[in-house]
Amino acid sequence: MASTNMASATSRFMLAAGIPSGANGGVSSRVSFLPSNRLGLKLVARAEEPTAAAPAEPAPAADEKPEAAVATKEPAKAKPPPRGPKRGTKVKILRRESYWYNGTGSVVTVDQDPNTRYPVVVRFAKVNYAGVSTNNYALDEIKEVAA
């Protein structure tokens, strides 16, 4: 006695009815059954409005240049100034809960993304209790010092 899995049989079936109906005012609808790895069956239904013909654009006069032919180049936007101290700068740590509070370290890198909360990576000569020698700080938690 052989058993047949109906989900696998119908997953290969695809129905695309593109017949416009008069009741919908010329709106065509499509229904598709596509194979899916998770459920074995996926239903997709779309309704489309008929597209209206775009009005023809008037031809440009003989003495006018088309807009596409005009070579106007937009000036490139200037880059914003870099955030934070430069790489290698010595900084003092102002975060009270930090292991390196009032200590100095050198800047490894600064993330330029404005959404980054702690963009400045600082490396220290001394390791903390966990054996770590770097930490991230916010721009207001560090102060540049003379080397």
Curated annotation (Swiss-Prot):
InterPro entries: Elect_transpt_acc-like_dom_sf (IPR008990), PSI_PsaE (IPR003375). One of its GO terms (biological process) is photosynthesis. It is found in: Plastid, Chloroplast thylakoid membrane. Belongs to the PsaE family. Keywords: Chloroplast, Membrane, Photosynthesis, Photosystem I, Plastid, Thylakoid, Transit peptide. It comes from Hordeum vulgare. GO terms for cellular component: chloroplast thylakoid membrane; photosystem I reaction center. Residues 1-46 form a transit peptide. The keyword Thylakoid applies. Residues 50-61 have a biased composition (Low complexity). Stabilizes the interaction between PsaC and the PSI core, assists the docking of the ferredoxin to PSI and interacts with ferredoxin-NADP oxidoreductase. It holds the Pfam family PSI_PsaE. This is Photosystem I reaction center subunit IV, chloroplastic. It is a peripheral membrane protein. Residues 49-91 are annotated as: Disordered. Its main location: plastid.
